[in-house]
From Swiss-Prot:
<dbReference type="GO" id="GO:0006166">
    <property type="term" value="P:purine ribonucleoside salvage"/>
</dbReference>
<dbReference type="GO" id="GO:0003999">
    <property type="term" value="F:adenine phosphoribosyltransferase activity"/>
</dbReference>
<protein>
    <recommendedName>
        <fullName>Adenine phosphoribosyltransferase</fullName>
        <ecNumber>2.4.2.7</ecNumber>
    </recommendedName>
</protein>
<dbReference type="InterPro" id="IPR050054">
    <property type="entry name" value="UPRTase/APRTase"/>
</dbReference>
<dbReference type="InterPro" id="IPR005764">
    <property type="entry name" value="Ade_phspho_trans"/>
</dbReference>
<keyword id="KW-0328">Glycosyltransferase</keyword>
<dbReference type="GO" id="GO:0016208">
    <property type="term" value="F:AMP binding"/>
</dbReference>
<keyword id="KW-0660">Purine salvage</keyword>
<keyword id="KW-0963">Cytoplasm</keyword>
<comment type="similarity">
    <text>Belongs to the purine/pyrimidine phosphoribosyltransferase family.</text>
</comment>
<dbReference type="GO" id="GO:0002055">
    <property type="term" value="F:adenine binding"/>
</dbReference>
<dbReference type="Pfam" id="PF00156">
    <property type="entry name" value="Pribosyltran"/>
</dbReference>
<dbReference type="InterPro" id="IPR000836">
    <property type="entry name" value="PRibTrfase_dom"/>
</dbReference>
<comment type="pathway">
    <text>Purine metabolism; AMP biosynthesis via salvage pathway; AMP from adenine: step 1/1.</text>
</comment>
<keyword id="KW-0808">Transferase</keyword>
<dbReference type="GO" id="GO:0044209">
    <property type="term" value="P:AMP salvage"/>
</dbReference>
<dbReference type="GO" id="GO:0006168">
    <property type="term" value="P:adenine salvage"/>
</dbReference>
């Protein structure tokens, strides 16, 4: 059973007209979760994409990023919602469909020039990933690549990231959503 078939689709959530791709059904399946981690790990080992650290976006990026840090032997740094980190932080505002939001990370999370794999569960508009990349660059890091379980290419995030010069990998896509 492939990864895509383990992802539940919930129509009209969080609002009418949205087809929500719920990865919790994939994560609760031990075989599915192992497939995700094994396939992303294999991709980075086989393709020689070099990075020093894995950074995960709150919250599901923590689940994937933490497991990848273990399998790839890299450290892990979280990017969190404001007010969740105890040390000095730097933040980045980004656009939502209706309004803005912020994410932050510790200002001393990376040494200058650290190459990073940015991880999140799903790529839609690209706003969260761009905010994460901006934070990494603010503290002196370099985004080596981005990894997602799901890409929704018709929403435009992949195109937006690639136009900004970022490369990415995703395990599966849902088109037309």
């Amino acid at each position: 059973m492939p990864i895509k078939s383990r992802i539940r689709t919930i129509p009209d959530y969080p609002k009418k007209g949205i087809m929500f791709r719920d990865i919790t059904t994939l994560l609760k399946d031990p075989v599915g979760f192992r497939l995700v981690i094994d396939q992303i790990t294999q991709h980075y080992l086989e393709n020689g994409i070099n990075f020093d650290m894995i950074i995960g976006m709150e919250a599901r990026g923590f689940i994937i990023g933490g497991a990848l840090s273990y399998t790839l032997g890299k450290g892990f740094v979280p990017i969190r919602k404001p007010g969740k980190l105890p040390g000095e932080t730097v933040n980045q505002e980004y656009q939502l469909e209706y309004g803005t939001d912020k994410v932050e990370m510790h200002i001393d999370a990376l040494e200058k020039g650290t190459r990073v794999l940015l991880v999140d569960d799903l790529l839609a508009t690209g706003g969260t990933a761009l905010a994460g990349a901006a934070l990494i660059e603010k503290v002196g890091g370099v985004v080596a690549d981005m990894a997602f379980i799901v890409n929704l290419p018709d929403i435009g995030g992949q195109k937006k990231l690639e136009e900004k010069g970022y490369s990415l990998f995703s395990l599966t896509e849902f088109e037309g959503d």
